[in-house]
């Protein structure tokens, strides 16, 4: 995991079957890569059984931010994805404590999820404080990538947006460098207050250390 993310310190256990059936899915990378058609589409209809605005968070960790959104917006649906299971167990605990019916967590490699999202299925995408993974051998694991932006351009509804926050200047610069290749996306600098309706653990953590937090609202351009 990236800096500041320490799932090994979380003393949590896997949710019992009846809770997992409601809130948790595990999509193994090998199966998702070779037989993606065996997994449901990542859409409100595909995962919740009804149509509603859907927000997807990549790297949701313990689900603190996404659960707060789900509680505040009961008529929308929310899906959190993380490549590490233990933080998601804590996320499920939060969802249970809030008796939330509009949220689901998926243990999976986000990069393999892109292909399972139908066109124009998402109202918004959240990518807040992703690990920079700047060592050379980790470059192919970056969530800030052409593949992410290609996914956003295809899967966001017109007027939908990707909310991006980072405390890492190189990651912010990389996002700005990649965006011109995607004319269907329009990026606008945005303050933390504009993008984050709630301060997550990592938001508080990096702000407390005095790090500068930069944000972009990356909107899917309305079609003519």
From Swiss-Prot:
Pathway: tRNA modification; N(7)-methylguanine-tRNA biosynthesis. Signal peptide: none annotated. CDD domains: AdoMet_MTases. Keywords: Methyltransferase, S-adenosyl-L-methionine, Transferase, tRNA processing. Substrate binds at residue 167. Its EC number is 2.1.1.33. Pfam families: Methyltransf_4. InterPro entries: SAM-dependent_MTases_sf (IPR029063), tRNA_(Gua-N-7)_MeTrfase_Trmb (IPR003358), tRNA_methyltr_TrmB_bact (IPR055361). The keyword Methyltransferase applies. GO terms for biological process: RNA (guanine-N7)-methylation; tRNA methylation. S-adenosyl-L-methionine binds at residues 57, 82, 109. It is an enzyme of class 2 (transferase). It catalyses: guanosine(46) in tRNA + S-adenosyl-L-methionine = N(7)-methylguanosine(46) in tRNA + S-adenosyl-L-homocysteine. Catalyzes the formation of N(7)-methylguanine at position 46 (m7G46) in tRNA. Belongs to the class I-like SAM-binding methyltransferase superfamily. TrmB family. This is tRNA (guanine-N(7)-)-methyltransferase. It comes from Chloroflexus aurantiacus (strain ATCC 29366 / DSM 635 / J-10-fl).
